[in-house]
Amino acid sequence: MKLRALDISEANSYIKRILINDPILSNLKVKGEISNFKVHSSGNVYLSLKDETSKLNCVIFKSNFNRNLKLDNGVKIIANGYISVYERDGAYQLYINEIEIEGIGNLHIEFNRLKEKLNKEGLFDPKYKIPIPKMPNSIGVITSPTGAVIRDIINVIKRRYPKVNIKLYPVTVQGDKSAEEICEAIRFFNHMKNVDTLIVGRGGGSIEELWSFNDEMVAREVFNSQIPIISAVGHETDFTICDFVSDMRAPTPSAAAEIATPSLDDINYKLGNIKSRMSKSLTNQIELDQYRLETVFNKINNYLDSYTIKDKVIQLDKIYDKIIFGIENNLKLEDEKLVKIGALLHNLSPLATMDRGYSITQKNGKVINSIKGLKIKDSIDIVLKDGNLECMIDKIENKEG
């Protein structure tokens, strides 16, 4: 008998009917440790149950979910339900109807033990946190070289702050060698000192997949780093030891890129605000100085207009008038004295004597005031007020004899 080819939906539907009708799979009870626990916004719960070698995807519908149960990653449970196929994806999963809590898984016990130990040593103390540089020149990224994480980090950084230099140190982010590679990367950047900030991260996953970032060796290397480290491991609900010892925890790798870089738009906005404040401050200072100058000028003018100044000016005017009057009076008195002296000198002048009819007799340019030395026929000059006479002596009389 030749069978026709089935559509994928037909094949998945057929498998689903087989699983539902199986007496064991239709009422299956399993035990395991919860991993990838997530409560959807619809109210449905999605998780995986795992043991040392395998895992089984599970669903708890909202109507069957008991919120009083403290379910979380690492909790061991006994689950009862049925196996069916999610036809769209062709994936079989356990649809849980009942849950019984059995205990806590070994990895979560180890996680809590290490967390408590490092906390007591002070590795989580905020005083050891190094501030993240606000405007880095270079950022180191420690993650897988492939996948969405590194692409998201690069895209966010280049969009926000394109001038920054990105240095990738590729590592495996899960597996036996992962922890040692992460430690080597941190030591490398601290030795080179060529970056301002480090981002250590990976995408989401189960506690097993994230376990490298819960490794004590990685935790101590992160704590000892002289370069500030942003931890960006998993999704927002995932927490690792690396998150607690790092200088800053980011909920996602993209958020880490935003924390590590300023936004050019924010920088331009802040610069605009600074410019505006400086301009306003300068304008206010100029206006204040102008007001102060006007106040000083007004005070000076008011002082000059005061009665005290006016009185002093009047007093100075009076003193000036007195000085001028004294000078003029003294000049007048001195002028009168000069007139009198001039008159006296005029009266004593030979010219004044001539005005009264007197003359001056000279011989050879010398004044003659006696007949002694004169002889008949001597030539003499007689000076009058308006001219000279040349005479010859023809007679000499002596009054004494």
Swiss-Prot record:
One of its GO terms (biological process) is DNA catabolic process. GO terms for molecular function: exodeoxyribonuclease VII activity; nucleic acid binding. The keyword Hydrolase applies. It catalyses: Exonucleolytic cleavage in either 5'- to 3'- or 3'- to 5'-direction to yield nucleoside 5'-phosphates. Belongs to the XseA family. This is Exodeoxyribonuclease 7 large subunit. The keyword Hydrolase applies. One of its GO terms (cellular component) is cytoplasm. Heterooligomer composed of large and small subunits. Its EC number is 3.1.11.6. The lineage of its organism: Bacteria, Bacillati, Bacillota, Clostridia, Peptostreptococcales. Pfam families: Exonuc_VII_L, tRNA_anti_2.
